[in-house]
Design a protein with these regions (language model features):
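Catalytic phosphate/metal-binding cores of nucleic-acid and nucleotide-processing enzymes, i.e., regions
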Residues: 1-105
Length: 105
């Protein structure tokens, strides 16, 4: 992964972390140079947060990474938070996980 890509990823993590903190969530960054040793962000109970801040995203590959990491860290439903330049943040998760979360409410 190139330095520009790493920087953009770290910027995306900081941006999303700040937005979630503004909404009252106690979000902490795992560190952009952790290379999978810790989650991108932590602080949403029952949700594994995978952050992607790219122009061209392969959602299938990104979700596969989120699923692998959620199983590795045992921290919740694999959830992909992603955004392109000048676009709003989007959240992608498996329907079965969303239904489980929604039915708990």
């Amino acid at each position: 992964m190139g330095k520009t890509s790493q920087r953009k990823g770290a910027d995306g993590e900081r941006e999303l972390s700040g937005l979630l903190q503004q909404h009252g969530f106690d979000i902490q960054r795992g560190g952009s140079l952790s290379f999978g040793t810790v989650p991108d962000l932590v602080g949403l109970p029952g949700i594994h947060i995978e952050v992607k801040r790219v122009e061209r995203l392969n959602v299938g590959e990104a979700m596969a990474q989120a699923i692998r990491d959620a199983e590795k860290f045992h921290d919740g439903a694999p959830t992909l938070f992603h955004r392109r330049n000048r676009q709003p943040w989007l959240v992608t998760m498996r329907l079965e996980d969303w239904l489980e979360l929604y039915n708990e409410k």
